[in-house]
């Protein structure tokens, strides 16, 4: 894949034009290599040469988690000899779905988190304490480890759990940044308080948080985020949103007004129950098309996650789409007096 980190600071029109160029490459690749999408294009009489604009994606059916579950192997676009890494994610029908990554896909994954780190203001002067696993077929820990290497940060692979080991590492090596599931920070705070550790005076300045929301739809800290902030006000908390399927992430900048799209890596749509785009200010299902993926690219994949989106320029200088915190999963939302 080609790297273009400056594209996020271009005008919305330039970003859209760039993405449409990458979309054409993705469609050509899918038609040549994906059994699933070859079948879809044939059954629905889709001429990929007519898909020129992001709006034209509406001519193509969506892909669902059930499709992945039932036709897992048909999504694989490369020979087994090209597969370097295997990861899994939960499926809708019980069994996990396997995702395969090539060497190029791992480079893309590394670049994804390089962008995430730079979005939060990290640099090669920082030291990262990795507080999640990089094994057990888990993508995120490996992605952040590789992204930190690409940025040039020092990395301490502590893994998840064991507050005593986490604090011993902080005391010995003085990391400045953590990558963590935010509820674990509560356990770190509790351990520090019981053992007379002044956590607000330690070296840790910020944490990039995965797996759990920290803010509400107004970008204010939610109950979990506020609980951490009240006890550890010196620590900056950055929310993220990601999934194995997209092999990418949305990350907050220092304005804390939503997670930024990485336009080199995915196209995102927000769809209603009829798979039509929702207007800004309306909740929609996050639907993604991967760009630059070799092993298992996805086209109009519905994640099941419902959120709001924002398109106005961010004060950080980026002009990318931003996501709110996830409202919930499709099928778990309820209606009350016309409001989701």
Predicted regions, residues:
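Glycine-rich, often proline-containing surface loops adjacent to acidic residues and nearby aromatics
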Residues: 92, 127, 205
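Short aromatic/hydrophobic contact patches that present stacked aromatics
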Residues: 98, 129, 333-335
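Beta-strand-connecting loops/turns
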Residues: 125-126, 281
């Amino acid at each position: 894949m080609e790297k273009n980190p400056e594209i996020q600071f271009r005008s919305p029109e330039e970003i859209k034009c760039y993405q449409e160029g990458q979309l054409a490459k993705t469609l050509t690749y899918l038609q040549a290599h994906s059994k699933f999408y070859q079948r879809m294009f044939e059954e629905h009489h889709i001429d990929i040469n007519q898909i020129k604009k992001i709006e034209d994606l509406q001519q193509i059916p969506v892909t669902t988690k059930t499709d992945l579950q039932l036709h897992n192997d048909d999504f694989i676009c490369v020979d087994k000899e090209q597969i370097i890494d295997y990861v899994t994610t939960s499926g809708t029908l019980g069994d996990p779905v396997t995702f395969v990554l090539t060497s190029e896909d791992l480079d893309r994954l590394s670049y994804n988190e390089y962008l995430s780190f730079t979005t939060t203001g990290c640099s090669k002067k920082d030291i990262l304490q990795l507080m999640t696993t990089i094994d057990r077929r888990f993508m995120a820990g490996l992605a952040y480890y590789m992204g930190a290497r690409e940025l040039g940060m020092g990395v301490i692979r502590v893994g998840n759990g064991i507050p005593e080991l986490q604090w011993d590492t902080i005391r010995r090596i003085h990391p400045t940044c953590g990558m963590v599931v935010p509820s674990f920070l509560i356990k770190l705070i509790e351990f520090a308080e019981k053992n007379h550790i002044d956590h607000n005076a330690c070296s840790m300045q910020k944490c990039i948080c995965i797996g759990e929301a920290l803010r509400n739809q107004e970008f204010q800290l939610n109950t979990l985020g506020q609980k951490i902030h009240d006890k550890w006000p010196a620590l900056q908390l950055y929310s993220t949103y990601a999934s194995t399927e997209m092999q990418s992430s949305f990350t907050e900048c220092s304005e804390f007004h939503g997670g930024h799209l990485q336009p080199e890596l995915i196209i995102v749509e927000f769809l209603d129950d009829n798979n039509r785009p929702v207007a800004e200010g309306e909740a929609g299902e996050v639907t993604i098309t991967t760009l630059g993926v070799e092993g298992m690219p996805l086209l109009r994949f519905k994640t099941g996650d419902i959120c709001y989106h924002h398109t106005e320029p961010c004060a950080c200088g980026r002009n990318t789409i931003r996501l709110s915190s996830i409202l919930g999963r499709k099928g778990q939302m309820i209606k009350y007096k016309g409001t989701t």
